Regions:
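Outer-membrane beta-barrel porins/channels
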Residues: 24-52, 121-446
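N-terminal, post-signal peptide beta-strand-biased segments of exported outer-membrane/organellar beta-barrel
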Residues: 21-136
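Bacterial N-terminal signal peptides that target proteins for export
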Residues: 1-9
Length: 446
């Protein structure tokens, strides 16, 4: 068996970078005012390859990349190949809000590792994959000042601060197999883990009043399963139609939450509340299930188009009543609901095997998406939506199917009818490297 040490070294290096990223604390890996609700912003699953096509992937079959959006897609590969995928992402955001007090504007940018996945064959038409990706991100920092003259006259200036950080990661192990050369099925075991910190402070300029600090630290963990299938039908010598579907089970989250509240004056602190709530099998917090369907049409390795739809039900999540998933002092009523996503994308490669012009070997992609979040605000049920366009290119490197994907995601998040809600404009840059090598080939001697 021939093993490429360079590919193995790059894969190991990427693995330790991911481990280091999941252990970081004290810095935001993501930032959004809307991440104050629930367990934060749900991370869009997929590699740089699928993200550059609007986030599709349920019906994608490409032997050159690892498509971990659908467990059944792991079977689309060379039967003797080892594959790895490593990605990073940078979010650049501008926030706008119009209220009775005026117009407000701010900006933020963050950097995070988006995925690390390994895949290799098991036997004949079956294959295995293992990886880690973010599931949700929390990152926000609010500051406001008391404006009531009666309160200011009694206590002096009062500052309210709220900030949060952390998130949930998902580690997954999956396998798939192909039957009758057309039907592929796959299954995945998912382990959720992560820490979310949410803090609220009230600070008085009058030292005769004690500052109030309160917050929640949640350690979450849980397991679930995901299933997928793909059916590929040839429509001609090069043309093929693929139907795909995925389903992720809902799950009760375990772990614990530390709830605290204390008052400080100078260097002295008095603990007012400190307790630990155990979440194990309590049903207090529950991640919603998710159903996805997709259809794609492709012509060999020249072009492909795809449309996906996803629906996730979070109405029984328990976030509405559990304090640790809210921010103290928030004026908005948070309610879990059903999230939906519509995604469409295309890929075009002029000539993958061209030996004269490098740019003809480059793959060009684009896509559109509309995402409705898993929560709404206020009794009237104001939805939070995201809409955007994506662009991307994959540049072949080294030899074989190795490539580097660079993509952009331009979009807006918020309520498109209500300008009093924060409008989040973003330009996301993502870079992914897919490594491909033949490991399970016997050397022949003459």
């Amino acid at each position: 068996m021939k093993v490429n040490c360079k590919v193995l070294l790059l894969a190991v290096l990427a693995f330790f970078l991911c481990i280091d990223a999941t252990a970081q604390s004290g810095a935001h890996n993501a930032y959004s005012p809307y991440s104050v609700y629930g367990v934060g912003d749900i991370f869009k699953e997929g590699s740089a390859y699928t993200r550059s096509m609007g986030g599709v992937g349920i019906a994608t079959r490409n032997r050159r990349i690892i498509n971990f959006t659908n467990p059944a897609a792991v079977t689309a590969r060379d039967s003797l190949s080892f594959m790895a995928d490593f990605g990073v992402i940078e979010n650049n955001k501008i926030f706008n809000q119009t209220t009775d007090a005026g117009k407000f504007k701010s900006a933020n940018n963050t950097f995070n590792i988006s995925d690390f996945v390994l895949s290799f064959p098991i036997w004949r038409s079956s294959a295995f994959m293992v990886g880690i990706t973010p599931f949700s991100d929390v990152g926000y920092d609010f500051t406001s000042h008391e404006t009531d003259p009666d309160i200011i006259g009694k206590t002096g200036n009062v500052t309210y601060q709220s900030y949060g950080q952390g998130g949930v990661y998902q580690f997954f192990v999956g396998a798939g197999a192909t039957f009758w050369k057309r039907l592929s099925v796959g299954a995945e075991f998912i382990y959720y883990f992560g820490t979310i910190d949410k803090v609220s402070n009230t600070v008085y300029t009058d030292e005769s009043y004690r500052a109030i600090n309160s917050g929640y630290t949640m350690q979450l963990r849980g397991t679930t399963g995901k299933f997928g299938l793909q059916y590929e039908q040839k429509l001609g010598s090069d043309l093929s139609l693929t139907l795909g579907a995925t389903y992720r089970l809902s799950t009760n989250m375990g772990g614990y939450a530390n709830v605290y509240r204390f008052a400080t004056a100078s260097e002295v602190s008095d603990t007012l509340i400190f307790r630990t709530d155990t979440l194990r099998n309590s049903g207090k917090l529950r991640f919603g299930d998710e159903l996805g369907v997709g259809i794609s049409l492709s012509s060999g390795e020249n072009w492909s188009v795809e449309f996906d739809y996803l629906r996730s039900d979070w109405r029984k999540s328990g976030f509405d009543s559990y304090q640790g998933t809210m921010v103290e002092g928030s004026s908005s009523t948070f309610r879990s609901t059903v999230s939906q996503s519509f995604r469409a994308g295309f890929e075009y490669t002029p000539n993958r095997n061209d030996i004269r012009y490098y740019m003809k070997k480059v793959s060009y992609r684009g896509g559109l998406y509309f995402d409705r979040q898993y929560y709404c605000l206020d009794p009237s049920g104001r939805n939070v939506d995201a809409i955007g366009i994506t662009l991307g290119m994959t540049f072949p490197v080294f030899k074989g199917n190795n490539g580097i994907t660079v993509g952009l995601d331009f979009g807006r998040k918020g309520n498109f009818k209500d300008r009093s809600m924060v409008g989040e404009h973003y330009a996301t840059i993502f870079v992914g490297m897919n490594l491909h090598d033949i490991w399970f080939q016997k050397t022949m001697y003459k």
